[in-house]
Design a protein with these regions (language model features):
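Catalytic domains of cell-wall/extracellular-matrix polysaccharide-remodeling enzymes
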Residues: 1-133
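Low-complexity, Gly/Ser/Thr/Pro-rich intrinsically disordered linker/tail segments
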Residues: 123-149
Length: 149
């Protein structure tokens, strides 16, 4: 599809990333690749599909101190509309905090700003955060504080 065509040229993808970071005034060496749940933090790699791998390999070949971070779970559109979907996501995140895995107590939830344009969706997001803090003692931090970054 459209993302595959976009990602076909890693030089262009990287150029876009650099341009967008400069335009937005971002100085972080952390990147999320569009349409790709791919990770590279130091020597750790996870879920690097072929397209993402090419971009990551390019950054490595340029000796860029770049981290690529994906997500452990994501907020789906139906969670913005249905509270039961929010409860399901709360349980999923809670389970991830106790599951044996790399960076066990650290969970990245992918959220897209366009999913929070209604008062209902904002109420659901507030509930999500509060319930994770109450039930699982979750702490929310900037991605820059993720282990290894």
């Amino acid at each position: 599809g459209r993302l595959n065509r976009y990602n076909a040229n890693p030089d262009s993808v990287w150029s876009d990333i650099v341009h967008n970071k400069e335009f937005l005034g971002l100085t972080s060496n952390i990147t999320r690749l569009p349409g790709s749940n791919s990770w590279k933090i130091g020597n750790y790699r996870r879920g690097t599909n072929l397209v993402a791998y090419k971009v990551i390999k390019l950054a490595d070949s340029l000796h860029l101190p770049q981290h690529f971070i994906g997500w452990d779970t994501e907020w789906q559109l139906n969670a913005s509309e249905q509270m039961r979907q929010v409860d399901s996501l709360i349980q999923k995140v809670g389970k991830l905090t106790i599951k044996k895995r790399t960076n066990q107590k650290h969970v990245v939830v992918l959220l897209h700003d366009f999913l929070f344009r209604t008062s209902t969706s904002l109420t659901h997001l507030t509930y999500f955060i509060e319930q994770l803090q109450i039930k699982y003692k979750c702490k929310f931090e900037w991605i820059e504080n993720y282990p290894g970054v």
